[in-house]
Amino acid sequence: GFLFYDENGNGTTDGAESVRLPSVGVSIGGQTGTTTAGGRFSLASVPNGAQSAQARTETLPAYFTATGVSVTVPATGDVALPARLVIGSRNRPNVYLAFGDSITVGEGSTDEEGYVDDLEAQMRTFWGKADIVNAGQSATRSDAGRSRLPGELGRHRPAYVLILYGTNDYNDPACRSAFPCFTVEMLRDMVQDTRSAGAHPIVGTIPPVNPQYADRNPTERNDWVRRMNDLVRQMAAQERAQVAEIHGDFMRQASLPPLFADFLHPNDAGYQIIQQAFFRAITQPLPGAAATFADLGPTLLLPPGARP
C-alpha cells in the first residue's frame, strides 16, 4: 500500500493528489511497518478479514494528522492510507513561503538563490510536489518582517511559512542594550499571524556570524545570537511551532569560517545547512507529537495565540 497526503480530506486519492509520505510508521491489524520511497509499505502476517489501518500519529510530519480506515485483508489492490494537513480553505497545498531577510534572499550563494531552490527540489524528490515562493527582503529586521507578513500571506496563500528572522536585529542599539528587545515577540506574532491565515509556521533559529571577522565583534555577537535562540526555542515550544535548528546545525560543524561568504551571509556550504534544517523540520514530527495531535481542533493546529 501507500500513504498519501489527502489534500481535500475526502479519504480517497484523487487525480491531483500526488504527494506520498516516506519514513512514516503505519499499522494494519496490529502489524506495523514504515513507509519507504513513494510512501510505499508492505506488511506481512496481517490477519485476514476487516482490519483497522492508519499512519502512526507520532511519526507523521509536523502538523499532519491521520485517522483510521477499515480495510479488508487480503486486499485486492493497493491500500491507500490518507494523512491530512489542515490548512485554510483558500490556502494552496504544497506551497511554501520562504520569509526573512537577505539570508532568505540568498545573498552570498553562487546563484544568489540561497537555500530555496535546492529545498524545493529536495521536497519534490521526497514528497512529490513543492513550490517555494521567496519573499525574502534584504536588510530587514524582525519588526519589519512582522509588518509585511500579512500582505505576503494574503498574496501567496501558502500552506507553510519558513520564518528566518533576527540576524539584523543585532544592529538595532536597543537590541544590544536592552536584550532581548523585540525579536522574540515579533517572531511570536509571525507564528500567530501565519496560523491566523490558515498556514503552518516553521521557525528557523538564527545562524551564527563568521568568527573570522575580528574587527566586527563576532564573539559578542555570537553570544547574543546564542542567547536569543534560547528564547526563540522557548517561544516555539510555547506556541507548539516546529523549529528548523539552523543555529545548532552550524555549531555542530568542525569550523564556521568555511561556511560563510562574508561576515553574515552563508556560502553554498552554509546554505546547504539551512536547507537541510528546513527539510527536516518540514518532514519530521513535532516534538511531543502524540500529545500535540491529540488536542487538534477542527480547522487549525492551534488557535492563534494558544499556549500549552
Task: Describe these PLM feature segments.
Residues 208-307:
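Catalytic His-Asp segment of secreted/periplasmic serine-dependent ester chemistry enzymes
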Residues 69-90:
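Extracellular beta-sheet/turn segments enriched in Thr/Pro/Gly and aliphatic residues
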Residues 7-15, 20-21, 27-44:
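Short, acidic Ser/Thr/Gly-rich low-complexity loop/linker segments typical of extracellular
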Residues 164-170, 191-226:
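Active-site segments of SGNH/GDSL-like serine hydrolases
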Residues 47-62:
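A short, solvent-exposed beta-strand micro-motif common in secreted/extracellular proteins
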